[in-house]
Amino acid sequence: MGRSIFINGVSGISAQTEEAIFNNEPLVYNSNIFNAVPANYKEVIPAMALRRMSKAIKMGITTAKNALLEANINVPDAIITATGEGCKQDTEKFLETVLEQKEELLTPTSFIQSTHNTVGGQIALNLNCTGYNITYSQEDISLESAFIDAMLLLEADLDINAVLVGSVDEVSPKITSFSYLNTSEGAFFFVLSAEKKINSKVEIVAISTFKEKDVLNISVEIQQFLNSNNYTISDLDIVLLGKNGDLNQDVVYNHLAKELFSTSCILGYKHLAGDFNTVTGFAMWLTCKIFKNNHIPNVLKLNTNSCQNPKLGLLYNLSQDNTTHSLILLRKI
């Protein structure tokens, strides 16, 4: 891609707050489900509308509008949303109603609000945005797919000045409890532009996804990704690994940490935010905050390598089925 892509606004809601992380006092959870810390939704959404919204919609609209506010944008030219599992709470409501009413006299509200593109549609309605609007749902690379689409859109259409890109996933009482993983929820939105502005803080250098099972070939893919963007492993200041405690995944993460990133400052984040399909949104939000604050909290560090002024960060994540990999390269401006 020829044009530089900049992040001009960022907002996130997750199981941790910015203050908790950067004060090295993270919130502690005693169950395998980490619930997102609620934002002050009433500041962004009218009370009457708020009562009818699920958590996913509340989080999505709030983070989207806060990111736009930071970027000084009223209405974006396009909205691209990512979700791994959609609006699970409304899905549960609809399925329970189907069973309780024996498939008769069903109201459409829960069904309509359970579809994966609900959040993107609600954001567009709230902002009165009639531009390009699409939702990606590719499990663990949903957000990466959304970002790649946004970058292609900014590359192809010079009339597009601001693209709102983000992700939303939520937990639900029944469906989520089926899993024994440390799972969580969150919403993260970013305002992208091909034009560098005063409030531009981070550049998205490149994003890539690939499939590979052999750990040695994974290392080769990562090095080729960096080389294609005129960087090497030694250029990396911080590396964020999506390590989640899964023993099968640890084989890959531990190999990369020891053999490939041994000189870099390696950070983890899933021990704080849990793991879910679009958790890379938390990693991107966190990297933007590290660049902004010029500080790496000790609670994130997975090794003893230090970095006083991080300017280049690589985010690596492995899908829950251990087959799909994502790479996101971010540079501080």
Where are the regions that the model predicts?
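Loop/turn elements at helix/coil->beta-strand transitions in domains of secreted/extracellular proteins
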Residues: 159-161
